[in-house]
């Protein structure tokens, strides 16, 4: 059953200001209750769902600004929900997983999630990551030098910086908001190597004190290569700087 309640009443929400709607999906009622209470106390509207099917119904009905999504759930697990959502939306997704294996944790990222946290997790850290992702989503402008320059071209790739859209050989390539921001950052400074930590700060908005897993960056780079490179195993655009990070090795041209 999809649930929505307002902790603290209308007066408190008006005082804090509505920061957006978050969909919390978890089959554990205690986790749903804790997250809903904490997030509403700091100004978010929160809707909860207890399984994957409810989550998809809630998304279609409410179009939330961000989703906190558990992996292990009845009916349809978090992986399945993430796959379905990515067919129609680039809404930020933070996955929660109790699975101990690193490969299991990374699977959600490979399916299009923006970030993940392992259970048990710190609610305060989750709140911080939510703020970071929503801030990046709401503020589409970046410090990147190419922002709003129009259409940029590299071989058969076209990047419309105004519409935040990418095309390959004339076909639009669907990118999540994080994937686009990552590509834009690297393309802004061709040849410049960015460490994983710098990318987490620039793209995810995390500060150095946040102990985010840098493998999040690696998985998103892999997803970009799969979508943009003719041969992802031997990339021509996004290269690895050994022992450092990643860089974009080609200089884009403005389309006139």
Where are these regions (language model features)?
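Basic, amphipathic DNA-recognition helix from helix-turn-helix-like DNA-binding domains
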Residues: 27, 83, 87, 92-153
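Acidic catalytic/metal-coordinating carboxylates
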Residues: 51-54, 77-80
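Active-site beta3 strand of CheY-like receiver
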Residues: 62-68
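Positively charged, aromatic-enriched patches within helix-turn-helix-type DNA-binding elements
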Residues: 165-177, 181-236, 241-244
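Receiver (REC) domain active-site loop signature in two-component systems and cognate sites
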Residues: 73
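Conserved acidic segment of CheY-like receiver
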Residues: 18-30, 35-39, 67
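Short hydrophobic/Thr-rich beta-strand motif most characteristic of the beta2 strand and flanking loop
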Residues: 43-50, 58
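Short, Lys/Arg-enriched segments at the junction into DNA-binding effector domains
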Residues: 18-21, 131-193, 197, 248, ...
């Amino acid at each position: 059953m999809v649930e929505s309640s307002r902790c603290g009443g209308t007066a408190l929400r008006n005082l804090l200001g509505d920061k957006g709607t978050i969909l919390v999906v978890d089959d554990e009622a205690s986790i749903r209750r804790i997250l809903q209470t904490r997030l509403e106390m700091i100004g978010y509207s929160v809707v909860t769902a207890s399984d994957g099917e409810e989550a998809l119904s809630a998304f279609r009905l409410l179009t939330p600004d961000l989703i906190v999504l558990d992996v292990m759930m009845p009916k349809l697990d978090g992986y399945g929900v993430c796959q379905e959502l990515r067919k129609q939306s680039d809404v930020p997704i933070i996955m929660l997983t109790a699975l101990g294996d690193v490969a299991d944790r990374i699977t959600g990222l490979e399916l299009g999630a923006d970030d993940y946290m392992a259970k048990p997790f710190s609610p305060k850290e989750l709140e911080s990551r939510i703020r970071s992702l929503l801030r990046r989503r709401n503020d589409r402008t970046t410090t990147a030098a190419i922002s709003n320059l129009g259409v940029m071209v590299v071989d058969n790739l076209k990047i419309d910086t105004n519409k935040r859209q990418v095309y390959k050989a004339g076909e639009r390539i669907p990118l999540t908001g994080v994937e686009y921001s990552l590509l834009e950052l690297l393309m802004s400074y061709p040849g410049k190597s960015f460490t994983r930590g710098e990318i987490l700060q620039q793209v995810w908005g995390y500060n150095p004190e946040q102990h985010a897993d840098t493998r999040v960056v690696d998985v998103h780079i892999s997803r970009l290569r799969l979508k943009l490179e003719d041969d992802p195993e031997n990339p021509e655009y996004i290269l690895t700087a050994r022992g450092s990070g990643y860089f974009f090795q080609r200089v884009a041209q403005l389309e006139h």
